[in-house]
Swiss-Prot record:
Entry protein name: Angiogenin
Coiled coil location: none
Species this protein is from: Sus scrofa
Annotated tRNA binding sites: 45-46, 104, 126
Biological process, per Gene Ontology: angiogenesis; antibacterial humoral response; antimicrobial humoral immune response mediated by antimicrobial peptide; defense response to Gram-positive bacterium; hematopoietic stem cell proliferation; innate immune response; negative regulation of apoptotic process; negative regulation of translation in response to stress
Record carries keyword Thylakoid: no
Amino acid sequence: MVILLGPLLLVFMLGLGLAPLSLAKDEDRYTHFLTQHYDAKPKGRDGRYCESIMKQRGLTRPCKEVNTFIHGTRNDIKAICNDKNGEPYNNFRRSKSPFQITTCKHKGGSNRPPCGYRATAGFRTIAVACENGLPVHFDESFIITSQ
């Protein structure tokens, strides 16, 4: 019996050791999500805004075709991952309330910098993928405009 418990204990201890690694990975994915899609207080919401922020965030090597920035608080965005401001939507969570957003679309041409972008500002509900209560992926294809 003692011999059987040894390997079980080892597996249990390894599992405990891997849990922090998994949480750290989720934090990294959340940080990446924020870098790509979060801008609390945009300075203007036109083409120059898009060209500037896309370059600052490292999204122009190569020029990213489409990227949306969410303007709100981190807590409001995180709340989509629970029932406070989110609801299930396929494999994602859809926000119950609209967010102010800016979508930057590449004007075309070369995918090498300098990248030109068109900005579309608006309010809409958004869909995100969540892991351990944190948003880790923004669904660019989900578009429902608010009334």
